[in-house]
Each structure stands twice: as structure tokens, then as C-alpha cells.
Amino acid sequence: MNGFASLLRRNQFILLVLFLLQIQSLGLDIDSRPTAEVCATHTISPGPKGDDGEKGDPGEEGKHGKVGRMGPKGIKGELGDMGDQGNIGKTGPIGKKGDKGEKGLLGIPGEKGKAGTVCDCGRYRKFVGQLDISIARLKTSMKFVKNVIAGIRETEEKFYYIVQEEKNYRESLTHCRIRGGMLAMPKDEAANTLIADYVAKSGFFRVFIGVNDLEREGQYMFTDNTPLQNYSNWNEGEPSDPYGHEDCVEMLSSGRWNDTECHLTMYFVCEFIKKKK
């Protein structure tokens, strides 16, 4: 009987516990009031700010932004290497007919001809040969006179004239010397201005003048071996000679000087000293 009563009380306790758990799960307290009503009278405030978290991993690369404004012009770079030779340009217009050239060299002897009639021509052959030489010299002199008549410039001490035959620098030197002059040497501003005006009014762009550094690289001299001590009129940035081949000098129609390659051909100016009376 006692054992049955003990079992009954235990079962009642278990049922009471289950009942209380059921009430709690339904949101009711012991007084059968909804839990929500109890919580509604209390204000839930946020807690204090937590510590900074660890730095996260880098995000993905963003999209490209808009192109910015163009920056200022940079400093001029160093001179680059010489490029490959360009393509051959279009053929230029046909120039005006030039003067008749000088007599060329003798050709290869031809085949022996047939025997001719007997003639006592020995005394004439020497005369004919000398006549041919005289005619060749006369043609050369006439060409020189023609150039001089076309226009000269002069100062109190010198004559200047433009030779309108394209020659390289050494040929120009020889041409002037054979005729008793030299390539023009503008040793002061007055002479330089006179020659430049002469070139410009003749309709030319550039001519050889008597200045070079053929004897010693970088040390420019007049053709009479005097240095450029008192006067020179180099163009801006000249003499440049980036590859070591520009040893001769040209004058532009502006009067400025440029160093240039000696093998180029162009017109040139000779100067002659006036004979004292």
C-alpha cells in the first residue's frame, strides 16, 4: 500500500513538472499572464560599442575610372638612334634645262680603219689638237663669266658671286681656287648679311661657305685656317653633328649657319679680293 502511494506521488510530480513546462512554452507565467505583457513594460537598450574587428581581405579590383586631364608637356628626350633608311620618295618635277657640260674624257680607241689617201697632214694635226684644248678652256671661261654677269655683290675689299653649279664641298673649294678666289668666309656681321641677302634675292635656300672642321673634329675653321674667334652665326642647336659626319658648313638664306655632310651637292659662294689700284 505504501509502495502504491509512493508511485502515485511520483507520477503526480512528473505531471506537475510537465504542466509547468507547457505553461512556459505558451508564454504564460505562474499567474497565467502572457510573457509579452511582462516584457512590454521594459525598454531594451543597445549594448556598448565593441572593439574594432580585424582588417578584412582586399576586395576585387574596381572598374577603370575616367581618363584624366592631359598632363604638362614633358622635358625633351635625348636624341634617339638613327632609324632605317626610308622608302624612296616620288620623282620630283623635271628641272629646267642646264648649261652644256664640259668636254668629257676620251673614249676607248676604235678599230683600225681602212687605209686612206696619202695626205701631208702632219703639220695640221698639232694645230688641231691645240685648237681643241683652247676651245675647251674657252667654254669653261665663258661659263664662269656667265655666272659672274648674272650678278655679283661687293664690299670695299672683296667681290662675292654665287656659282650656280651643284658641287660637293671639296669640288666647291677647288672651283673657287682655280679662279683665284676662295669659298666665301663671312668673318663679320656685315659680310654675313650681304651674302645672306644675295642668296635670298637669288631665290636659293642654302649654299656652301668656307667654314669646316675637317682638320680637327669640333674645331671649326675658315678655309684660310683662321679660327672662328670674332664672329659666327650658328643656327639654334648648331653645330650638332650627332653621328660625326657633318664636317662642312652651309649658310641658309636667313644668314644662319648649319653643319652638314661634305658629300652633299649644292650651289656655293666664291669670294675674290679686289686688286689695289
Swiss-Prot record:
Residues 40-107 are annotated as: Disordered. GO terms for biological process: cell surface pattern recognition receptor signaling pathway; complement activation, lectin pathway; cranial skeletal system development; positive regulation of opsonization; proteolysis. Highly expressed in liver, placenta and adrenal gland. Moderately expressed in small intestine, lung, stomach and prostate. Weakly expressed in trachea and spleen. Glycans are attached at residue 258. Residues 1-27 form the signal peptide. GO terms for cellular component: collagen trimer; cytoplasm; external side of plasma membrane; extracellular region; extracellular space; Golgi apparatus; serine-type endopeptidase complex. Residues 53-112 form the Collagen-like domain. SMART domains: CLECT. Belongs to the COLEC10/COLEC11 family. Lectin that binds to various sugars: galactose > mannose = fucose > N-acetylglucosamine > N-acetylgalactosamine. Acts as a chemoattractant, probably involved in the regulation of cell migration. This is Collectin-10. It comes from Homo sapiens. The gene is COLEC10.
